[in-house]
């Protein structure tokens, strides 16, 4: 397979170590780079000041979704795949300039051990998109759509830029929203 934008290519591995079951995900990292998703996240989201960056959080959640993750706990599946973690480390090192890598290192109080965030920081991150004041306006038994807060509006801008990229290359007049019809008992 030809090499894309990011510094990886697919090769047959003779050893057992470094093998990944998530070999298709780096192609999506390549697509995210071409689409400028990272830059869009950096431009519109300013939630994290320490530790994991907004870009790392959002891309981790996107990759989790693409890998078939059902919940935040499934981030452990990404972290537990040694081959995938090696690819992520290499991509992170290659796409950042030296100054950016140093700034990233300074965000951490302790040395970073993981490639993908654990569930606790992700839950705290996701909580930033929720406005508890809006919940006070909820009426029991009625549908309720809260007014988006600053962070959710930023995420909406990231989503708009992703759609603009796609629309710019393959214009469509109709968009279909596919919903899973699976019944879940509550």
Regions found by a protein language model. Name each.
Residues 1-186:
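Dynamic "connector" segments at or just before major functional cores
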